[in-house]
Amino acid sequence: METLFNGTLALAGRDQETTGFAWWAGNARLINLSGKLLGAHVAHAGLIVFWAGAMNLFEVAHFVPEKPMYEQGLILLPHLATLGWGVGPGGEVIDTFPYFVSGVLHLISSAVLGFGGIYHALLGPETLEESFPFFGYVWKDRNKMTTILGIHLILLGIGAFLLVFKALYFGGVYDTWAPGGGDVRKITNLTLSPSVIFGYLLKSPFGGEGWIVSVDDLEDIIGGHVWLGSICIFGGIWHILTKPFAWARRALVWSGEAYLSYSLGALSVFGFIACCFVWFNNTAYPSEFYGPTGPEASQAQAFTFLVRDQRLGANVGSAQGPTGLGKYLMRSPTGEVIFGGETMRFWDLRAPWLEPLRGPNGLDLSRLKKDIQPWQERRSAEYMTHAPLGSLNSVGGVATEINAVNYVSPRSWLATSHFVLGFFLFVGHLWHAGRARAAAAGFEKGIDRDFEPVLSMTPLN
């Protein structure tokens, strides 16, 4: 099937003759060499953690405390700040040392992982089954595979509980909704009611509902992690103690490539959900660090000009816009008072700077006339001018704007990158699922090389 370009590159047990895969097929050569595959995975983890540590230190070195994080192209420090490290009231950075510590810890960890990866790739045993049966496996061994699945689930559950412990006991996390403009606080009364937590999963994904992406208080987020961590840990114990049922043995393909396809499918779903979360959610991804969401920037613009024109004498409750609808305020189909104009489509935005001006029926006209605070005006003007729009050449804002600034929101980068990676992972899922099913059905060899059309064509040279 494959062409070997250079036989001298081959290593024992990893060449085309013994594995059926050439050097460029990567880890496919290691499908049946558990020791070498371990080395590849540990080394890969080392590269990932090295990037995290190095990029972390790079961001610390370039960080300017006087500017918001989202103006500095940062994607790692906002995550650390959201976890409550180094920030105070209003999301102001008061100490960058925790960020430095995080970078150094990741660099040190990556050195350990790098050593382990090189050791297992070059020096360690080719296979683990003989010497270390606990760590050895055969891809067809369904019982062993579900045990490995269980161990992974327990580790994921522990990860979820790490966030819970940080929020409850280790200094708390940043809450953008804290009174007075956001602050780090310990989460005391978790939401553990299953009807609330699982109610998110049953919501519609569309406007005004927003599925799990609509979560807007930290009690629910941390409570959700308690539920998820518990489910992962108990599910992990279950999978370690049990063997797959007959229906699962029949329904699933039990091969290394099949497991790869399942994993890629799961990661793809994670990528798409993360994309929606970082784009729309300003509680898990506070606007103080990531910049405003798209709807938030749009509503902020409407609010900013409502404030300006009200000062100039406009009656914002009755002014008509060019379409005959309200220029500043209008009613949604269900009767709430919402901002008028193009931003009406973002009527369901919730943001800490806007909610104090709402009453039981949407925006409260008397509060808009009497209660707008200077901090709300400043915040909305700032968000209006930092919309998560931007082109590849890093000129942010609306594409036709002549006074554009050199700004692209981290929200744009994080949402776009997770969408693109989620898509690639989905294609990889389809590819490997197709190959795994074909192999299980016994026709994985592909097209017949003896009658390939290219063989009857004139050579290129």
Curated annotation (Swiss-Prot):
<dbReference type="InterPro" id="IPR000932">
    <property type="entry name" value="PS_antenna-like"/>
</dbReference>
<keyword id="KW-0148">Chlorophyll</keyword>
<keyword id="KW-0464">Manganese</keyword>
<keyword id="KW-0150">Chloroplast</keyword>
<feature type="modified residue" description="N-acetylthreonine">
    <location>
        <position position="3"/>
    </location>
</feature>
<dbReference type="GO" id="GO:0016168">
    <property type="term" value="F:chlorophyll binding"/>
</dbReference>
<keyword id="KW-0602">Photosynthesis</keyword>
<dbReference type="GO" id="GO:0009523">
    <property type="term" value="C:photosystem II"/>
</dbReference>
<comment type="similarity">
    <text>Belongs to the PsbB/PsbC family. PsbC subfamily.</text>
</comment>
<dbReference type="GO" id="GO:0045156">
    <property type="term" value="F:electron transporter, transferring electrons within the cyclic electron transport pathway of photosynthesis activity"/>
</dbReference>
<dbReference type="GO" id="GO:0009535">
    <property type="term" value="C:chloroplast thylakoid membrane"/>
</dbReference>
<keyword id="KW-0479">Metal-binding</keyword>
<comment type="function">
    <text>One of the components of the core complex of photosystem II (PSII). It binds chlorophyll and helps catalyze the primary light-induced photochemical processes of PSII. PSII is a light-driven water:plastoquinone oxidoreductase, using light energy to abstract electrons from H(2)O, generating O(2) and a proton gradient subsequently used for ATP formation.</text>
</comment>
<keyword id="KW-0934">Plastid</keyword>
<keyword id="KW-0793">Thylakoid</keyword>
<feature type="transmembrane region" description="Helical">
    <location>
        <begin position="279"/>
        <end position="300"/>
    </location>
</feature>
<feature type="transmembrane region" description="Helical">
    <location>
        <begin position="435"/>
        <end position="459"/>
    </location>
</feature>
<keyword id="KW-0604">Photosystem II</keyword>
<dbReference type="InterPro" id="IPR036001">
    <property type="entry name" value="PS_II_antenna-like_sf"/>
</dbReference>
<protein>
    <recommendedName>
        <fullName>Photosystem II CP43 reaction center protein</fullName>
    </recommendedName>
</protein>
<keyword id="KW-0597">Phosphoprotein</keyword>
<feature type="binding site">
    <location>
        <position position="355"/>
    </location>
    <ligand>
        <name>[CaMn4O5] cluster</name>
    </ligand>
</feature>
<dbReference type="InterPro" id="IPR044900">
    <property type="entry name" value="PSII_PsbC_sf"/>
</dbReference>
<keyword id="KW-0472">Membrane</keyword>
<feature type="transmembrane region" description="Helical">
    <location>
        <begin position="122"/>
        <end position="143"/>
    </location>
</feature>
<dbReference type="InterPro" id="IPR005869">
    <property type="entry name" value="PSII_PsbC"/>
</dbReference>
<dbReference type="GO" id="GO:0046872">
    <property type="term" value="F:metal ion binding"/>
</dbReference>
<dbReference type="Pfam" id="PF00421">
    <property type="entry name" value="PSII"/>
</dbReference>
<keyword id="KW-0007">Acetylation</keyword>
<keyword id="KW-0157">Chromophore</keyword>
<comment type="subunit">
    <text>PSII is composed of 1 copy each of membrane proteins PsbA, PsbB, PsbC, PsbD, PsbE, PsbF, PsbH, PsbI, PsbJ, PsbK, PsbL, PsbM, PsbT, PsbX, PsbY, PsbZ, Psb30/Ycf12, at least 3 peripheral proteins of the oxygen-evolving complex and a large number of cofactors. It forms dimeric complexes.</text>
</comment>
<keyword id="KW-0812">Transmembrane</keyword>
<keyword id="KW-1133">Transmembrane helix</keyword>
<feature type="transmembrane region" description="Helical">
    <location>
        <begin position="243"/>
        <end position="263"/>
    </location>
</feature>
<feature type="transmembrane region" description="Helical">
    <location>
        <begin position="57"/>
        <end position="81"/>
    </location>
</feature>
<dbReference type="GO" id="GO:0009772">
    <property type="term" value="P:photosynthetic electron transport in photosystem II"/>
</dbReference>
<feature type="transmembrane region" description="Helical">
    <location>
        <begin position="166"/>
        <end position="188"/>
    </location>
</feature>
<feature type="propeptide">
    <location>
        <begin position="1"/>
        <end position="2"/>
    </location>
</feature>
<feature type="modified residue" description="Phosphothreonine">
    <location>
        <position position="3"/>
    </location>
</feature>
